Amino acid sequence: AGFRFVASDRTGRPWITLFASWRPLNGYRSTITAEATSRVEIQAPERRRCFSMAVTATDERDRGQPTSWSAAVDALAAGRALDASSQGLIYLDDGSDPVQRLFIVSAGNVDEGALQVAHPDRSDTDAVHDPAQAWNALTVGAFTEKSIVQNPKWNGWQPVASAGDHSPWSTTGVVFADAWPIKPDVVFEGGNGVKNAKGEVDFPCPDLCLLSTHYRPAQKAFVLSWATSTATALAARMAAIIAADYPTLWTVTVCALVVHAAEWTAQMQTHLRGASGKRARARLVRRYGFGVPHLDRALRSAGDALTIIAQDSLRPFLPKASKPNERQMGDIHFFDLGAHQN
């Protein structure tokens, strides 16, 4: 398992540091995640960060239910400090205001042996992997715009997914119960696979993959990249650029800008128009999340679209004075946009 850390330097340009890959033989995944988070923060405590975690469990048995790993991600994202003990993880609360963290987590991949021509049926039944169901994490699935096969090696093969549709690699939250969060939150480019007339699926096809730098440049400069790990790296890059351009934004605001800058592709909207009923449309949201984020939309208002960002806190419900076990309406914030003057 590797742990990626994404940040921006003091000049405002985003950069990525890849820590050496390491695979612990023992220990809880939640403990490993907490320790990895602590190590980089100790090295440079004042540096702003986005944590990109493109590693998940290999099964989908949790189906949205919390686990010790997803709970640790939720706690770390909320700004809590964790420490390992003989009884597991314990919270370290010193009374200071928590410093929230942005965790960008891959949704997880469909098993290589389970890729099917009947896409996206397999993705819709393969649930997002642990810990990507964490409420406070930005969970990233994959879509693809890559649908042109030119390599002579793949003559007679066609792309599995249509351009603008769900990547065949990406898991979804379609089978989650309604009580659990919508996951993935967003989707980024994750590549495609190829299929032939016999119903066989193959990968990787260079035409349908992304090109990235190899983690050992002395061995080779570039390597093919695909699936939700690639999509997560792209999401982390976008979040780091937003944080670098707007250093005063809260972590949750950066996350919100990524999500609010997303929109469904024309192909995704085709499925939406063909969906009959509210439940069918809800299933599509749990497949695509809120769509594909666009950096320009996050950084700048498009045309005459006004974007108002309010960073504040409130308590929407308060205990009743006469009945403390019951709740009443609490805070509400109003924003005066000014009256139009003739």
Predicted features along the sequence, with ranges:
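A Trp-anchored, charged/polar loop motif used as the substrate-binding/catalytic surface
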Residues: 2, 24-43, 122-123, 160-173, ...
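Catalytic-core environment of secreted peptidases
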Residues: 142-160, 164-232
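Substrate-binding/access-modulating region of protease and related hydrolase catalytic domains
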Residues: 15-134, 147, 218-226, 230-232
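Contiguous mid-protein beta-loop-alpha structural module that forms a pocket-lining wall or clamp
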Residues: 231-234, 240-243, 251, 255, ...
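Active-site alpha-helical elements of protease catalytic centers
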Residues: 1-11, 31, 223-243
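Secreted peptidase-domain scaffold signal
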Residues: 279-342
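Short, flexible loop/turn elements at secondary-structure junctions
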Residues: 2-4, 20-23, 55-57, 107-111, ...
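Subtilisin-like serine protease catalytic core
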Residues: 1-29, 46-51, 62, 97-100, ...
